[in-house]
């Protein structure tokens, strides 16, 4: 008896990626939901897991990841004055790579937290008049990071906009709430018990965030819930800020690429 050859059924075709910033997903073989690739200028190849509604494949195990193409949101700033020379690069869609050399060891450690917990790629190279004190370098680095963040965010289409995270570190706990609104405001409720951590003047923590807020145009609230160790309090602050910023900069697929504002615009002007 002759057996007819098996012909694999054709898979449904994906909708065109040009239809909208967030095209309607299609259902692939095995029930997986697949989002078509979308390219914005230069692109970065990332691995994204394609899951069924239950989060597993038909055999009860996670489905194999598929590749999608998304853009990298990048910002780069060079700030040169008679006091400092600062170069900052940030990738909001990074993997948590930190490369910081500021001349202020404790600040380098805090920028590592920003990269690691925000999953941002952060490059900061700075020289300055640290023979006087760390004030000018601390300020100008924060100003440059804020400006790079502003560049990377662009028109802010499709982002969550708001972020909220509380980070503990041993006895310390710090809550951060932020809004990428375009309106700069800082409320900082830290009570750091010592004047220095290593050689770093702890007054500069609030000044760092004020400078970053001024150029990025974010609303930022920092509240210390607990803590009596200065290092722990400051590090918990940077960790909470990183996670809140990560939440705010991530995309909300339900927004379909629209600006998250009833006014239809989020900007400094």
From Swiss-Prot:
Named cofactor requirement(s): Mn(2+)
The enzyme's E.C. designation: 4.2.1.19
GO molecular function, one term: imidazoleglycerol-phosphate dehydratase activity
InterPro entries, per database record: IGPD_sf, ImidazoleglycerolP_deHydtase, ImidazoleglycerP_deHydtase_CS, Ribosomal_Su5_D2-typ_SF
Annotated Mn(2+) 2 binding sites: 135, 139, 207, 232
Record's keyword terms, sorted: Amino-acid biosynthesis, Chloroplast, Histidine biosynthesis, Lyase, Manganese, Metal-binding, Plastid, Transit peptide
Residues that bind substrate: 83, 109-117, 135-139, 161, 183, 231-239, 261-263
GO biological process: L-histidine biosynthetic process
Pfam assignment, any one: IGPD
Region (Disordered): 1-31, 54-73
Record localization: Plastid, Chloroplast
Record-listed Mn(2+) 1 binding positions: 109, 136, 231, 235
A GO CC term attached to the entry: chloroplast
Family: Belongs to the imidazoleglycerol-phosphate dehydratase family.
PANTHER family: IMIDAZOLEGLYCEROL-PHOSPHATE DEHYDRATASE, IMIDAZOLEGLYCEROL-PHOSPHATE DEHYDRATASE HIS7
Cited NCBIfam families: PRK00951.1-3, PRK00951.2-1, PRK00951.2-4
Name of the protein this chain belongs to: Imidazoleglycerol-phosphate dehydratase 1, chloroplastic
